[in-house]
A protein has these predicted regions:
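Alpha-helical transmembrane bundles and membrane-interface segments of multipass inner-membrane proteins
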Residues: 1-180
Length: 180
């Protein structure tokens, strides 16, 4: 197993520690929120690092193409669900984001059944970056950054929808060739 794939697996393994830390004392401990944020930031940076290493050293694998975006989904969605629990994000936002992830995962499964691996799109990458930045600020829950956080959240939701449309349009052949 190569280094980028190990970083992807590390990101997934960090999720339970992140969740436990963020939800400690129902999110009332600012110290634990900072620790949770640091875990989230480190996990997010492994996403950036694994992709750069894979491309630079020609270590791109089908496992990485499939697992890297899945690890991102798991990290971001677990954070968003925790933020619902803490009363910091409307449930409808998380429903939109998670619905998009299920739809894209469905596309990937159909493609995989046909021997096709679909890599993440640029819109999907932008979406992930904005979701991660939004989560980082929401975890800190700083009143001074409330407007910036709200703006980032709106951009993240818009990019979620745009990336879904882009993905469906670019990969509609998967549905027609997949017998749907």
């Amino acid at each position: 197993m190569n280094l980028p794939n190990k970083l992807t697996i590390l990101r997934v393994c960090m999720i339970p520690f992140f969740v436990m830390t963020l939800l400690f004392d129902h999110g009332n401990s600012q110290f634990m929120r900072v620790i949770a944020d640091l875990i989230f930031i480190f996990a997010s940076l492994t996403d950036l690092l694994d992709g750069k290493i894979a491309r630079k050293y020609n270590l791109v694998t089908n496992f990485g193409k499939f697992m890297d975006p899945l690890a991102d989904k798991l990290l971001v969605c677990s954070a968003l669900i925790c933020l619902i629990e803490l009363g910091q994000i409307p449930a409808w936002v998380v429903i939109v984001i998670i619905s998009r992830e299920f739809i894209i995962s469905g596309f990937r499964l159909v493609a995989s059944d046909n021997g096709v691996v679909i890599a993440a799109s640029y819109w999907g990458k932008f979406k992930t970056v904005f979701q991660m930045l939004t989560v980082i600020l929401m975890i800190l829950n700083l009143p001074a950054l409330a407007m910036v956080t709200s703006l980032l959240l709106m951009i993240a939701v818009a990019l979620t929808i745009i990336s879904l449309v882009d993905y469906v349009v670019k990969n509609r052949r998967v549905l027609t060739e997949g017998g749907m």
